[in-house]
Amino acid sequence: MKLTCVLIISVLFLTASQLITAVYSRDKQQYRAARLRDEMRNLKGARDCGEQGQGCYTRPCCPGLGCRAGATGGGVCQQ
């Protein structure tokens, strides 16, 4: 009987602490997916265009740059 009481009280306590934690952390994670998406877009390797000095064989150069033949035979983004 005592063991059953202790188990019931501990389950109620753990459930209450989980609910309190969930309510507390809800506002902190509201836009987490959008923030991670924006961070991925800003990474240097995730850009859609090649910057000055980068190769332009597999992707186009950024606006204002043109693809010029490089010394190794591949194209390089230059002004």
From Swiss-Prot:
This protein's GO CC annotations: extracellular region
Organism whose genome encodes this protein: Conus terebra
Cystine connections: 49-62, 56-67, 61-77
Signal sequence, start to end: 1-22
Family: Belongs to the conotoxin O1 superfamily.
UniProt entry keywords in alphabetical sequence: Disulfide bond, Hydroxylation, Ion channel impairing toxin, Knottin, Secreted, Signal, Toxin
Domain remark in the UniProt entry: The presence of a 'disulfide through disulfide knot' structurally defines this protein as a knottin. The cysteine framework is VI/VII (C-C-CC-C-C).
PTM-bearing positions, type 4-hydroxyproline: 60, 63
Expression across tissues: Expressed by the venom duct.
Subcellular locations according to the entry: Secreted
UniProt protein name: Conotoxin Tr6.3
Function text: Ion channel inhibitor that inhibits the increase in intracellular calcium upon depolarization in DRG neurons. In vivo, both intraperitoneal and intracranial injections into mice induce hyperactivity.
Residue span(s) of the pro-peptide: 23-47
Molecular function via GO: ion channel inhibitor activity; toxin activity
Pfam families linked to this entry: Conotoxin
